[in-house]
Amino acid sequence: MEQALSIVVLAAGKGTRMRSRYPKLLHPVGGRPMLDHVLRTAFSLEPEAVHVVHGHGAEAVQAAHADWPVRWVVQEPQLGTGHAVEQAIPAIPDDHQVLVLYGDVPLVRPETLQALLAEADGGLGLLSVDFPDPTGYGRVLRDGHGAVTGVVEHKDATAAQRRVTECNTGLLAAPAGRLKAWLQRLDNDNAQAEYYLTDVIAMAVADGVRVAAYPVADPAEVQGVNDRVQLAAAERVWQRRQAEDWMRAGVTILDPDRFDLRGHFAAGEDCRIDVGVVLEGRVELGAGVEIGPHCVLRDVALGDGTRVEAHSVLDGATAGRNCRIGPFARLRPGTDLADGAKVGNFVETKAARIGPGSKVNHLSYMGDAELGRDVNVGAGTITCNYDGHSKHRTEIGDGAFIGSGTQLVAPVRVGRGATIGAGSTVTRDAPDEALTVARSAQRSIHGWRRPGQRPDRGEGSDA
């Protein structure tokens, strides 16, 4: 019978090296808090329970993860990793296997942890890694036959022990009953005056319990995050992983080192993503979608064959099939482009529906607007949707043509097939199939001089 699993996540550290007012574990990797990554991995192993030991910033950490069905355990004071596990262990049945994870080690894969649990096999298992520069890490000690005899922390290691490059990651699996007994025997007679969880390894050896060290293949999986330099390194590892996964799924990413996914992503085959693209929130791309360089997409859904040109920002927008967006376009929340619609360079939209085949090509603002089918909006056209108190809508019928430099003062309706003369300020509804021109008559004032060219005061007087 497979042994039941309980997971303990250590998340009580202060994170002083982050130099931040926020708890370390709330700093994001891939758009999600570090601890969120660890919890997702933990629950993927289908444990009986997950216990999170927290301390510094406890209320903020718990509030940010309120949707997770975890047991929160406060460690106060914080006296080391062994002391932290001791706070959670009483609630775990003796016949469970315990897996200890760390909230600031966000990149470990579920497959690695499954291998560690299998390697432990009723004994004690620890995850080890070979670091070319092991400074700061606890060293795994072995006897002449290669059997694990213990772990010594860097500060407590001798010169000979510091030359060992096999390091302890801190991730550990052990039988709950035995772990409880070992934790009761811990002392803090060490350089940091803390209760080290790693001391249970020597206890296991002394008690004749098999100790297995499972070496992780990719050191990046177990890289801890203690400062912002390490946070940035973890971010790039995470992003590279996501990029490679999507490339294997049929998405072309021109440079996986310049790709940022910070939320949920779904894409059809043959999508193409250029350099410097940032995807946030929930982004869904149909087949054959192309995203140009240095675009930001946040909570966006794009239909098959749609193309977004360089330096465009899309937020809370949707587009149908074969749309063209940008370059330098900004689509704000509530924007919906029907099939074949086009929003061109330096165009901003907000709460606007652009109908099938309609075009807003240049230097325009469409806010709180409804455009029908095959509408053409000339350069420099804006909807004046806000009167200082309320927002008002503009409706433009199928096939309408709006001349350049037009102001549509909402609420207003432009009829089907209507034409608006360039430079008009439209304040009343424009009828179907009619030309509407709303601008003052042109006049020329002869002899007019600019202010700097006007004669001095008193020039030509008899005084």
From Swiss-Prot:
Highest taxon listed in the record's lineage: Bacteria
Keyword Cell wall biogenesis/degradation: yes
Localization of this protein: Cytoplasm
Region entry Linker, spans: 229-249
Residue ranges of the region described as N-acetyltransferase: 250-463
Catalytic activity: alpha-D-glucosamine 1-phosphate + acetyl-CoA = N-acetyl-alpha-D-glucosamine 1-phosphate + CoA + H(+); N-acetyl-alpha-D-glucosamine 1-phosphate + UTP + H(+) = UDP-N-acetyl-alpha-D-glucosamine + diphosphate
Gene3D superfamilies named in the record: Hexapeptide repeat proteins, Spore Coat Polysaccharide Biosynthesis Protein SpsA, Chain A
Gene Ontology BP terms: cell morphogenesis; cell wall organization; lipid A biosynthetic process; peptidoglycan biosynthetic process; regulation of cell shape; UDP-N-acetylglucosamine biosynthetic process
EC number of this enzyme: 2.7.7.23, 2.3.1.157
Binding note for cofactor: Binds 1 Mg(2+) ion per subunit.
Binding site for acetyl-CoA: A379, N385, Y386, S404, A422, R439
InterPro entries, sorted: Bifunctional_GlmU, GlmU-like, GlmU_C_LbH, Hexapep, MobA-like_NTP_Trfase, Nucleotide-diphossugar_trans, Trimer_LpxA-like_sf
Alphabetized Pfam families for the sequence: Hexapep, NTP_transf_3
One of the record's GO molecular function terms: glucosamine-1-phosphate N-acetyltransferase activity
Annotated region described as Disordered, given as residue ranges: 437-463
HAMAP family xref list: GlmU (MF_01631)
Function: Catalyzes the last two sequential reactions in the de novo biosynthetic pathway for UDP-N-acetylglucosamine (UDP-GlcNAc). The C-terminal domain catalyzes the transfer of acetyl group from acetyl coenzyme A to glucosamine-1-phosphate (GlcN-1-P) to produce N-acetylglucosamine-1-phosphate (GlcNAc-1-P), which is converted into UDP-GlcNAc by the transfer of uridine 5-monophosphate (from uridine 5-triphosphate), a reaction catalyzed by the N-terminal domain.
Assembly description: Homotrimer.
NCBIfam families per record: glmU (TIGR01173), PRK14353.1 (NF010933)
Name used for this protein in its record: Bifunctional protein GlmU
